[in-house]
Swiss-Prot record:
PANTHER family: RECOMBINATION PROTEIN RECR. InterPro entries: DNA_Rcmb_RecR, Rcmb_RecR, Rcmb_RecR_Znf, TOPRIM_dom, TOPRIM_RecR. This is Recombination protein RecR. Coiled coil: none annotated. PROSITE patterns: RECR, TOPRIM. It comes from Caulobacter sp. (strain K31). May play a role in DNA repair. It seems to be involved in an RecBC-independent recombinational process of DNA repair. It may act with RecF and RecO.
Length: 200
């Protein structure tokens, strides 16, 4: 890891390096920045992490993260129960919410089908999705999944599984670029893609 760094610093670098988008070099830079600013950055970050670990939970309805269960979105009576938007991860849900265009409910799958990575339907929240679709309130399931091979494979699988429920199954229009991830898109692109969705 870091030459002449103590085990505590090496452990910090190793843990930071495991975060998405950070490798060993970025982890080292982040660790140094945190240690240089202990009072203004490291201490508040430590408190925020402890707070998040103690209070944040997974919503038993949609799979989002919140401090309450059900989450604020699932508890919002103003939401349209007829529309159910399926996303890969919580980050995609947050991206949809930033756009402000969608007023329905969400379902977080917790990943995508991937033969290469050995991820099958049993590893995702597919059963819960089918249960919600069969519940009687949902009339349309919107598949807001990445325009990647795994995303499209998952979308087609879900469309096949949802067909017997009788709900309309749509996908976001191709305002979402191929290979794109919702979390990286601007609000206007997400809003346009949502308006131009089509049958799956």
């Amino acid at each position: 890891m870091a030459a002449s760094a103590g085990p505590e610093i090496e452990r910090l670098i190793a843990l930071l390096s495991k975060l998405p988008g950070l490798g060993p070099r970025s982890g080292r830079r982040a660790a140094l920045a945190l240690l240089k600013k202990r009072d203004t950055l490291l201490a508040p970050l430590t408190a925020a992490l402890v707070d998040a670990q103690a209070k944040v939970r997974t919503c038993s309805v949609c799979g989002s993260l919140d401090t309450s269960d059900p989450c604020a979105i699932c508890s919002d009576a103003a939401r349209d129960n007829r529309l159910l938007c399926v996303v890969e991860e919580v980050g995609s849900l947050w991206a949809m919410e930033r756009g402000g265009s969608f007023k329905g409910r969400y379902h977080v799958l917790g990943g995508l089908l991937s033969a290469l990575d050995g991820v099958g339907p049993e590893a995702l929240r597919v059963g819960e999705l089918l249960g919600r679709a069969k519940g009687g309130e949902v009339s349309e399931v919107i598949l807001a999944l990445p325009a990647t091979v795994d995303g499209q494979t998952t979308a087609h699988y879900l469309a096949d599984r949802l067909a017997p429920t009788g709900v309309s199954v749509t996908m976001l229009a191709r305002g979402v670029p191929v290979g794109g991830d919702l979390d990286w898109l601007d609000d206007g692109t997400i809003a346009q893609a949502l308006r131009a969705r089509r049958p799956a």
